[in-house]
Amino acid sequence: LMLRPIETPTREIKKLDGLWAFSLDRENCGIDQRWWESALQESRAIAVPGSFNDQFADADIRNYAGNVWYQREVFIPKGWAGQRIVLRFDAVTHYGKVWVNNQEVMEHQGGYTPFEADVTPYVIAGKSVRITVCVNNELNWQTIPPGMVITDENGKKKQSYFHDFFNYAGIHRSVMLYTTPNTWVDDITVVTHVAQDCNHASVDWQVVANGDVSVEL
């Protein structure tokens, strides 16, 4: 379980929800042509979070199968200098690969779980940074839900379903940057045990931290 960050005296959050640039990769050439290295060509504005399928009055976009690209320029607050900076996506359906400027920082398979990466080495406080995301919505036997992609008589990819709902896709939940101190708690595990007579109980706990920390229970 990955807990959602909240603002605290030692953690600031910058939401990246809003309008992003969006492009279809109809020829599946974006990776080979390294689209993340410059502004997306022939892009249009799209709302994040949200399904790309329902944001345009175009059946070809609604039923599109393959890679799509999102991009946004983001300003890193000058006050974040000296802090650890993390880029987090709450959900990307069904596969996402992320670049910060020209650096690939993470990829994730699974459209319903969050993922994040420490991007401190790739950003400079007080300057802007380009975030690019390649999203793939194709279903296969390993995705949830499963499915397959077929090619119609016109050579166009088409989703084949084994379930009773539409394959909505895109950056489906919030995107954010957040800070932590350079010494931070990375994970907390708490396991409780209750005796059958309910008269005794014990608690096992484990804290994983980066750096030397003291923990008060």
Positions of PLM-derived features:
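Accessory beta-strand-rich segments of carbohydrate-active enzymes
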Residues: 6-7, 12, 21-27, 60-187, ...
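Short, solvent-exposed loop/linker segments at the N-terminal edge
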Residues: 192-200
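N-terminal glycine-rich cofactor-binding segment
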Residues: 51-60
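Predominantly extracellular/luminal regions of secreted and cell-surface proteins
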Residues: 21-47
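Short, Gly/Pro- and small/polar-rich lid/capping loops
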Residues: 1-5
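Beta-strand-rich binding/interaction modules
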Residues: 100, 199-217
